[in-house]
Amino acid sequence: MVGEDRVIMSVKELRRVHVIRQTREKKLTQVQAGIVLGLTPRHIRRLIERVAQAGDQGLAHRGRGKPSNRRIPEKVQTKALTLYAQRYGDFGPTLAAEKLAERHGITLSAETVRGWLLAKGVTHFQRRKRPHRAWRERKAHVGELVQLDGSHHDWLEGRGPRCVLMAYIDDASSRVYARFYAYEGTIPAMDSFQRYIQRYGIPLAIYADKHSTYHSPAEPTVAEQLAGVEPRSQFGRALGELGVELIPAHSPQAKGRVERLFKTFQDRLIKELRLAGGSTLDEANRFLEDYLPIYNQRFSVQPVQPADLH
């Protein structure tokens, strides 16, 4: 009997069996049993009655072996997995759960979707262990430092031309501004920065890599050497006239926030553009106008200090 109980009972239930037996054998009072199990004497009496009627099995959870009332109906699971296979096969569980709710009215947690996919042998989304990195503390104020970079990628997945996403991410808040261009160069840099200014104002500093668009590759002239200044690109001169400091990043790791943004966008944004049917630069940029406010509302953070230094 005990062996059978042990198969179907939890450790907590087995402990109750032992204590209730001791109580029925008058080795413990009901008050003492209640103290041991953390239950009231009234509850102890109910357990004693249950054992008297059904034996030790009466202390097993009454819902064990029965389907949970909270269990998601099988037809919902089937529909969700069918939609995933048909439309979202390369999506991770989080984005898939968002789209199932947003586009099909099927509300599921990401962990539920993850579990269903793993049970079906779908594992492409498994998280990989990230290499350890030394985190640089964020700036305290919005507008104090903005990271800028361009990402060359097949953003439209062959539906349109390859293009470059010029992205600005505020260091203090992770707020993002971005726009697609045909190439990464002076004109796209100037145009995107002008649009950034019109939207948010002039930041104190821009942090960009050593691409020739941002930092001149020319050797300093004798006059520049004597003056202790570096040659500047056209973009660098424009920032200088606005009083914006242009800080060079010497490695991709130094631009950690914008590099991580591109990894996120190369997963999420590409799929969102696919669902929206974007196939031209104009369509992609119109999509960004609606997408970025939603993205920023979800993923930006509260800066340490409330003042905006733009």
Task: Walk through the language-model features, giving the residues of each.
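Residues that mark the N-terminal boundary/hinge immediately upstream of a DNA-recognition element
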Residues: 28-29, 92
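Basic, flexible linker segments flanking DNA-binding modules
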Residues: 55-154, 222-230, 308-310
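Mobile-element integrase/transposase regions
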Residues: 75-76, 86, 106, 118-176, ...
